[in-house]
């Protein structure tokens, strides 16, 4: 994995804009500013964020929001897992979903007319992150698959 030290430094500084820039992407904080502001609080000690993507993830059984349908989440690819955060508007609580890298079979990206989509295969099901910016989806999937391969080789 390239840029590990730079990613580590940016993660420690919580410089998410710098992380987007490092990956050759423009920051996408639309609808996820609150999630970005608390992301560092949900990381484990020495966990490194490699890339971020925002997109719509459907409500799950663990979601506590009163709303229905898909919500805008920030999803972080870290050295240990894929971490999804949704800051709920009404209760100011934060929904999280976390998938360890060793649970993940593959990550794929597809591109539509306007947006991209990321599909995470966890064996027992699929996690779909929809309405992502196309370049963000591509970078996320490429880096995720690199990390998964590295973890398998270790």
Give each language-model segment a name.
Residues 30-32:
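A positional/architectural concept
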Residues 54:
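Aromatic sugar-binding interfaces of carbohydrate-active proteins
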Residues 78-80:
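Extracellular/lumenal glycan-associated surfaces
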Residues 51:
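Conserved binding/recognition cores within well-folded domains
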């Amino acid at each position: 994995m390239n840029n590990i030290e730079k990613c580590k430094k940016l993660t420690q500084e919580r410089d998410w804009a710098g992380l987007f820039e490092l990956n050759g992407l423009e920051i996408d904080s639309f609808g996820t500013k609150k999630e970005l502001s608390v992301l560092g609080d949900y990381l484990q000690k020495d966990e490194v964020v490699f890339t971020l993507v925002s997109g719509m993830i459907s409500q799950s059984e663990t979601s506590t929001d009163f709303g229905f349908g898909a919500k805008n989440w920030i999803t972080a690819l870290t050295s240990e897992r894929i971490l999804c955060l949704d800051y709920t508007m009404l209760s100011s609580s934060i929904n999280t979903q976390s998938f360890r890298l060793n649970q993940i079979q593959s990550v794929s990206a597809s591109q539509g007319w306007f947006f991209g989509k990321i599909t995470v295969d966890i064996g027992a099901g699929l996690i779909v992150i929809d309405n992502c910016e196309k370049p963000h989806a591509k970078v996320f999937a490429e880096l995720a698959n690199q990390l998964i391969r590295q973890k398998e080789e270790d």
